[in-house]
UniProtKB/Swiss-Prot annotation:
Involved in the maturation of [NiFe] hydrogenases. Required for nickel insertion into the metal center of the hydrogenase. Belongs to the HypA/HybF family. This is Hydrogenase maturation factor HypA. It holds the Pfam family HypA. The keyword Transit peptide does not apply. The keyword Kinase does not apply. Keywords: Metal-binding, Nickel, Zinc. It comes from Methanosarcina mazei (strain ATCC BAA-159 / DSM 3647 / Goe1 / Go1 / JCM 11833 / OCM 88). HAMAP family: HypA_HybF (MF_00213). InterPro entries: Hydgase_Ni_incorp_HypA/HybF_CS (IPR020538), HypA/HybF (IPR000688).
Length: 137
Protein backbone atom coordinates (compact mmCIF):
# COMPACT_ATOMS: atom_id res chain seq x y z
CA UNK A 1 0.00 0.00 0.00
CA UNK A 2 2.06 2.91 -1.28
CA UNK A 3 -0.84 5.26 -0.50
CA UNK A 4 0.44 5.49 3.08
CA UNK A 5 3.85 6.81 2.05
CA UNK A 6 2.20 9.26 -0.37
CA UNK A 7 -0.23 10.40 2.35
CA UNK A 8 2.74 10.94 4.71
CA UNK A 9 4.41 13.23 2.16
CA UNK A 10 1.19 15.15 1.52
CA UNK A 11 0.48 15.51 5.24
CA UNK A 12 4.01 16.81 5.93
CA UNK A 13 3.74 19.36 3.12
CA UNK A 14 0.31 20.48 4.31
CA UNK A 15 1.50 20.79 7.90
CA UNK A 16 4.65 22.75 7.01
CA UNK A 17 2.75 25.08 4.67
CA UNK A 18 -0.08 25.65 7.14
CA UNK A 19 2.31 26.39 10.01
CA UNK A 20 4.36 28.76 7.83
CA UNK A 21 1.19 30.78 7.20
CA UNK A 22 0.08 30.85 10.85
CA UNK A 23 -2.83 28.46 10.37
CA UNK A 24 -4.99 27.39 13.26
CA UNK A 25 -6.85 24.90 11.10
CA UNK A 26 -6.62 23.31 7.68
CA UNK A 27 -10.05 23.33 6.04
CA UNK A 28 -9.47 21.71 2.63
CA UNK A 29 -6.62 20.13 0.72
CA UNK A 30 -7.16 19.79 -3.02
CA UNK A 31 -5.05 17.33 -5.00
CA UNK A 32 -4.75 16.77 -8.72
CA UNK A 33 -4.25 13.06 -9.28
CA UNK A 34 -3.48 11.57 -12.66
CA UNK A 35 -5.58 8.60 -13.71
CA UNK A 36 -2.35 6.71 -14.41
CA UNK A 37 -0.75 7.44 -11.02
CA UNK A 38 -1.61 3.96 -9.69
CA UNK A 39 -2.98 5.59 -6.55
CA UNK A 40 -6.34 4.75 -5.02
CA UNK A 41 -8.08 8.00 -3.96
CA UNK A 42 -10.14 6.32 -1.23
CA UNK A 43 -7.12 4.65 0.34
CA UNK A 44 -5.12 7.87 0.09
CA UNK A 45 -7.92 9.81 1.80
CA UNK A 46 -8.17 7.21 4.58
CA UNK A 47 -4.41 7.32 5.19
CA UNK A 48 -4.37 11.13 5.18
CA UNK A 49 -7.23 11.35 7.68
CA UNK A 50 -5.52 8.80 9.93
CA UNK A 51 -2.25 10.74 9.86
CA UNK A 52 -4.05 14.05 10.46
CA UNK A 53 -5.75 12.93 13.69
CA UNK A 54 -4.87 15.30 16.52
CA UNK A 55 -3.30 17.88 14.19
CA UNK A 56 -4.48 21.17 12.68
CA UNK A 57 -5.51 19.13 9.62
CA UNK A 58 -7.71 16.75 11.60
CA UNK A 59 -10.97 18.03 10.11
CA UNK A 60 -9.61 18.84 6.66
CA UNK A 61 -11.47 17.62 3.60
CA UNK A 62 -9.19 15.92 1.08
CA UNK A 63 -10.55 16.75 -2.36
CA UNK A 64 -9.15 14.70 -5.25
CA UNK A 65 -9.52 16.00 -8.80
CA UNK A 66 -8.78 13.25 -11.31
CA UNK A 67 -6.61 14.29 -14.26
CA UNK A 68 -7.14 12.39 -17.52
CA UNK A 69 -4.20 10.86 -19.35
CA UNK A 70 -2.86 12.95 -22.22
CA UNK A 71 -0.92 12.03 -25.34
CA UNK A 72 1.69 13.94 -27.31
CA UNK A 73 3.11 13.25 -30.73
CA UNK A 74 6.19 14.52 -32.53
CA UNK A 75 3.85 16.10 -35.12
CA UNK A 76 2.69 18.53 -32.43
CA UNK A 77 -0.57 16.85 -31.47
CA UNK A 78 -1.56 16.99 -27.79
CA UNK A 79 -4.84 15.58 -26.53
CA UNK A 80 -6.58 13.47 -23.94
CA UNK A 81 -7.12 9.75 -24.20
CA UNK A 82 -10.61 8.44 -24.95
CA UNK A 83 -12.28 8.66 -21.54
CA UNK A 84 -15.05 6.18 -22.41
CA UNK A 85 -12.55 3.33 -22.64
CA UNK A 86 -10.98 4.34 -19.32
CA UNK A 87 -14.33 4.75 -17.50
CA UNK A 88 -15.25 1.16 -18.39
CA UNK A 89 -12.63 -0.02 -15.92
CA UNK A 90 -12.23 1.31 -12.39
CA UNK A 91 -8.76 -0.19 -12.23
CA UNK A 92 -5.80 0.18 -14.50
CA UNK A 93 -5.54 -3.33 -15.85
CA UNK A 94 -2.61 -4.50 -17.94
CA UNK A 95 -4.99 -4.60 -20.94
CA UNK A 96 -5.94 -0.95 -20.46
CA UNK A 97 -2.32 0.12 -19.96
CA UNK A 98 -1.32 -1.76 -23.13
CA UNK A 99 -4.14 0.01 -25.01
CA UNK A 100 -2.93 3.42 -23.80
CA UNK A 101 0.75 2.69 -24.48
CA UNK A 102 0.02 1.58 -28.06
CA UNK A 103 -2.18 4.52 -29.04
CA UNK A 104 -1.50 6.14 -32.37
CA UNK A 105 -1.73 9.84 -33.04
CA UNK A 106 -5.14 10.71 -34.50
CA UNK A 107 -3.49 13.36 -36.71
CA UNK A 108 -0.50 11.63 -38.33
CA UNK A 109 -0.93 7.97 -37.33
CA UNK A 110 2.47 7.60 -35.66
CA UNK A 111 2.72 6.18 -32.17
CA UNK A 112 2.09 8.89 -29.58
CA UNK A 113 3.51 8.86 -26.06
CA UNK A 114 1.88 9.44 -22.69
CA UNK A 115 2.56 13.02 -21.61
CA UNK A 116 0.30 13.41 -18.60
CA UNK A 117 -1.96 11.59 -16.22
CA UNK A 118 0.66 10.27 -13.81
CA UNK A 119 0.95 13.38 -11.66
CA UNK A 120 -0.01 13.86 -8.02
CA UNK A 121 0.04 17.55 -7.12
CA UNK A 122 -1.15 19.53 -4.12
CA UNK A 123 -3.25 22.13 -5.94
CA UNK A 124 -4.38 24.14 -2.92
CA UNK A 125 -4.51 24.18 0.86
CA UNK A 126 -7.31 26.20 2.43
CA UNK A 127 -6.50 27.31 5.96
CA UNK A 128 -7.96 29.38 8.75
CA UNK A 129 -5.73 31.71 10.76
CA UNK A 130 -6.14 33.21 14.20
CA UNK A 131 -5.78 36.75 12.86
CA UNK A 132 -8.50 36.29 10.30
CA UNK A 133 -11.93 34.83 10.80
CA UNK A 134 -12.13 34.04 7.12
CA UNK A 135 -10.39 31.29 5.24
CA UNK A 136 -7.50 31.94 2.90
CA UNK A 137 -5.80 29.92 0.18
Amino acid sequence: MHELSIACEIFEQVKVTAEAHGATEVKHVTLQMGRLSHTNPEQLSFCFKTLAEGSIAENADLIVEMVPPTLECECGYTGTIDQERIRESNELTSELLAYIAAMDCPVCGKQAHIAGGRELIIKSIEIETENENESQR
